[in-house]
Amino acid sequence: MKKIFTTFLSLSSLFLLLVFSTNAQVKFEEFSSLEAMLSKAKKEHKSVLVQVESKECGQCNDVAQKGLSDTALKEKYAVNFISTLVKQDDNLLKEITNMVNLKSYEMGSLFLDYDGNLILKINSTTSRPMAYLEYADKAMALSKNTGLKDLEVRYKQGERSKELLIGLIQEKSKIDFDTRLLLEQYLDLLTLKEIRTMETAKLILEQGMPLESRAREVIYAVFPDSKVDSLFLSYPLEDRIKMNNKIITSTRQAAVRFKNSNLIYKLSNFISNTHQKNFEKANFHGQKTLVDFYKEIKDTTNFLQNAENFCNYSLFAVSIDTLKKRNGRERNEMFEQRGKLSGSFSYSPFYLQYGSELNNLAYEFFKHTNDLEKLAKALKWSKRSMEINEALVPDESRKQNPYFMDTYASLLYRLGKKDEAIETQIKALEILKSRGESTTNLETTLSKIKNGSL
């Protein structure tokens, strides 16, 4: 419940509150095995929604719960899908990820056809029911794509023709699936003359292969760096962002899988360079990449050291007044950009992430150290996170963040300030109750504070 994820917020309604109703929620069924789930899906000729709850981010799960609470949504999923809700460490999820060759999956929505083929992967949660309606429509359309199924059957039978591999690469990239192995198999079949074509260069770029991958080495070996950069810049901005995001995701996964610190430093530099016109964003995302890496590989010593540096010298070093000015300037620029565009428009307020990260890392210190000096620093970060939220959130009713208060209360308790911790936690609970949101996790924390077991 302590980890806060920054979500995309509409300019017209930055903080949307949806009242949850269990009667209106998508109906989730329990299954003892993958075989049982697919058997029912095939019998009813329906696709499958596997909604995966985060192990660490309780608020992310609450957000999904709200998003899946809508009458129209319930009806659509009941008619077209078998839906099941699983936790990150459930055996059913392990069966599914093994079947579809997913290395890992933390949270979000997986859509399968009734044969067990992955047709859509969403790596986030949202409180917007409309988003889940859009996912359903997309999954239904993709489930009718018999072309991909036919290609996969031929691949499983041992075929490795150029035509088959290029078809699989193109189809799987549409559903954000890892195409690294397929691309390398395809490149192995090409002559040097074929590799040196712009078509091959485009194919490699569009797949967003990880840094240090053989495919990237190939393209930079046969083309000058300037040629590759020029080709990349020829794509529309939206496509370039997608390609960079693929590179970042695939490289991060590779670095974590092999605990490769050299690779993560290269990724940190790569991410910083994508924000070369904005030093603040370059510094923020570059440092966050390192901190997240050491957390994921469970290197506590390096994690705490990098997190402390990130907080002290970047996040905490900027005053509230400065953040307010920069946030206002950014927001005005976004409004100006909105005036030049047609249709819907959304953006993620960058400077709010300072508060989110301070909160998240303060709580990580609560979990990983008993050093009173470090905990005292974490308490300051936690307090600053609440101040940032209050200063930058435009909606008066959302300025107080109960989840940040929850972190603050936990740290107060650990530092021996039990009465103040109880008072803070009670205030956080009152805010959640006034908004009609779930209070279960915060009530559990309050109980542990009172009985001295937190």
Regions found by a protein language model. Name each.
Residues 1-28:
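Bacterial Sec-dependent N-terminal signal peptides
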Residues 27-32, 52-53, 70-93:
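Thiol-based oxidoreductase modules, predominantly thioredoxin-like and allied folds used
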Residues 28-48:
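A short beta-strand-turn-helix
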Residues 44-48, 79-84, 106-107, 113-117:
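Loop/turn elements at helix/coil->beta-strand transitions in domains of secreted/extracellular proteins
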Residues 52-66:
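Conserved redox-active cysteine motifs that mediate thiol-disulfide chemistry
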Residues 68-69, 102-147:
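Non-catalytic, surface beta->alpha helical segment in thiol-disulfide oxidoreductase systems
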Residues 90-106:
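Structural alpha/beta surface segment adjacent to cysteine/selenocysteine redox centers
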Residues 152-454:
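Oxidative protein folding and maturation machinery
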